[in-house]
Amino acid sequence: MKAGIHPAYNEISVICACGHSLKTRSTHKGDMRVEICSSCHPFFTGKQKLMDTAGRIDRFEKKYKASRVGKAAPTT
């Protein structure tokens, strides 16, 4: 490899908004701040919220049922 053309590879701190901090190596200069990390992300913590899609569909149909009454299905 050619000398002098590669960026410096230094140890930096990655600091999350939740307060968790970790050390890594990067060409980034200075500390890096992130909004979410594996310590606070719902997928990794097991506190994942599942969406109730069946309930959402029922609410949609209930809301727009009145506008569909009396309309014939389109013919193609």
Curated annotation (Swiss-Prot):
Cited InterPro entries: Ribosomal_bL28/bL31-like_sf, Ribosomal_bL31, Ribosomal_bL31_A, Ribosomal_bL31_sf
Cofactor comment: Binds 1 zinc ion per subunit.
PANTHER family given in the database record: 50S RIBOSOMAL PROTEIN L31, CHLOROPLASTIC, LARGE RIBOSOMAL SUBUNIT PROTEIN BL31A
Protein name (database record): Large ribosomal subunit protein bL31
Cofactor(s) required for function per UniProt: Zn(2+)
Keywords: Metal-binding, Ribonucleoprotein, Ribosomal protein, RNA-binding, rRNA-binding, Zinc
Subunit and interaction comment: Part of the 50S ribosomal subunit.
Organism name: Solibacter usitatus (strain Ellin6076)
NCBIfam families per UniProt: L31, PRK00019.1, PRK00528.1
Binding site for Zn(2+): C16, C18, C37, C40
GO biological process: translation
Gene Ontology MF annotations: metal ion binding; rRNA binding; structural constituent of ribosome
Function: Binds the 23S rRNA.
Chain segments annotated as coiled-coil in the UniProt record: none
This protein's GO CC annotations: ribonucleoprotein complex; ribosome
Family under the similarity heading: Belongs to the bacterial ribosomal protein bL31 family. Type A subfamily.
This protein's encoding gene: rpmE
The UniProt record lists the keyword Ribosomal protein: yes
